UniProtKB/Swiss-Prot annotation:
GO terms for biological process: ribosomal small subunit biogenesis; rRNA processing. Belongs to the RimM family. This is Ribosome maturation factor RimM. The keyword rRNA-binding does not apply. Binds ribosomal protein uS19. Keywords: Chaperone, Cytoplasm, Ribosome biogenesis, rRNA processing. HAMAP family: Ribosome_mat_RimM. Residues 101-178 form the PRC barrel domain. NCBIfam families: 16S_RimM (TIGR02273). One of its GO terms (molecular function) is ribosome binding. It is found in: Cytoplasm. The keyword rRNA processing applies.
Amino acid sequence: MSATPEKADDLIVVGKIFSVHGVRGEVKVFSFTDPIENLLGYRNWTLRREGVVKQVELVSGRSTQKDLVVKLKGLDDRDEARLLSGYEICIPRSLLPDLTADEYYWYQLEGLSVINQDEQLFGKVDHLLETGANDVLVVKPCVGSLDDRERLLPYTEQCVLAIDLEAGVMRVEWDADF
């Protein structure tokens, strides 16, 4: 494990260390990938928390249904592992697999202006939630938005009509009163 002074500009958060596992320095990880095991395909991670950035190498990992238990190179002690709790796990954007024309990574949707069929600006996509049935867009008001309401919109084909990443716009079929 090594610290690095490099700024992590083009990194994507793909998981988070939330606890320790056992006494041999393993850590528990919540993976943001789908399926969660995809995180284990990236061997070199950048860990980030409150301005501190560390480079680590994944040695091994396994799934425990809801999360992962991983072993990092040079981390052999429970107390040392505990210090990594709360760190985000990041990888370079360039390592993400290419998607088809109608697929998007969550990070690409965050910040898009959300406009309904009546040309009303609801706000901007702040983040997404995974609910099981379908993902949910959390849209927060911004300058020029219709009102000051936060909206939760289903990320489904019925609701999301079009996405234009270059224009920074997502068009939705959603009534302003919902």
